[in-house]
Amino acid sequence: MTVSRRRFIQWTAAITALAPRGLRAAEPRGYRAELLPSQKEVWDQQVWMARLGPKYTGNPAHATFVDFLASSMQALGLEVQRDRYTFDRWEASGQPTIASKGRRFDVSSYFPYSGSTGAEGTTGELVYAGSNPRFDLSGVRGKVALVDFTINTRDWAHQYQAWGIHPPTETFPSASRPARGAINDLTPFQTAGAVAVIIRWLDVSPMNAADQYTPFSRPPQNIPGVYVGRDVGARLRALAGTGVRVTVVLEAETTADAPTETIVATLPGASDDDIVMLNTHTDGPNATEENGALGLVALAKYFSKIPRAERRRSLVFPMTTGHFAGPWVPSIRGFIQKNPDLIKKTVAAVTVEHLGCREWLDEVATGGAIGYRDTGRMEWSVAITPSKPMANLLVDAVQGSLDRAGVVNPVKGGFLGEGSSLSRAGIPTIGYIPQPNYLLAGPADGCIEKLSPELMHSQIEVFAKLVHRINGLTAAELRA
């Protein structure tokens, strides 16, 4: 979707008018910087977490991470509850391949929960079946279907109204085009009789497309699907329809009734009747998608050092599983369903996700080649809330930080992430959700080289200040 010039001018005028709020907000009452865990302590945990590899829902790396979170919270003196779920876990093994007559074609990644070919692969004539969303499936039976897509535009100028921007010299983008798969359902290809699907990225660089775990939280597709970059896809496109046969290999295992756990940690405050909730999810492919839980551990450590009598409200930390297995494991929705009494007591919620992100973008070079590079800036932190009181508190809390943040009101949808369900439950909620290109990428190093330890620590400090500011308001003021 193209954002019109008129809408862009309106958007720019609106955010420029709102940006100056709280240029130098006073420190919140009760904040004690010396109690915050050090940057080194937080980053050491981040490096350890990244070395676990992708923490897809319920896999061994994810289970190790969840155990670490539970034991860390217990060591800080918090009450810890573990809620167990089971589901049929699908996970790819080895590197997918495409081959034809001894020639190999590089595979960028696979479609999660798509299917499995076994080690021998599946072979069929290669045919081109169209570009998303217009496919011609009339001739795919018994064949390998090649399709392509362009990434979608998120029209932020339409979805959001800005409460405030930090730093105020920045202009919040009117739109975003992160690297996400646009084809969300392969079952029509399976129904039409195709034996495999090859999906080509058209407008994303090969480096950006590599290892993308997209789309996530989809039900089993029952047909193997793999991605290729635009250049490899162009070579395959030239072969499609010529009678050439290709073999696709995507090995995967399904573990029936695999266990996975949500962790709920509670730090009692002076009042048990009022709760501030700090939540995140624990499953994901890399160093940033699921690192919000490290932020919560740091915040729990900070607030546990403050005497209980000085903690106005109890803090509850739901760290949920199932963000990447939504059809089976309900993530924050399950927590809400299981804990109606806690939800009734919650006066505010802050969802913490995707910390420390630097901005990496594709850029078109001379000749049309697309390069992927670090822009030298921090990624935009999109902080979503329909609550004006909560927005004002965050706009003040972020002042002086390293964060590059847009605090926005989702007037036309776009409340992404784990905070949306809490907001729908009637809780004044901030969903803090930076959305870098590499958010769903699952390389061996977890994209940790794309993160900033300084930014991550600064963001955790912002959340600590935000909780203090929340506790400076009554429940009625927070709901105003």
Model-inferred region functions:
Residues 35-39, 46-164:
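Noncatalytic luminal/extracellular "stalk/propeptide" segments of secretory-pathway proteins
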Residues 141, 273, 320-429:
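Metal-dependent peptidase/peptidase-like ectodomains
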Residues 7-25:
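N-terminal export signals
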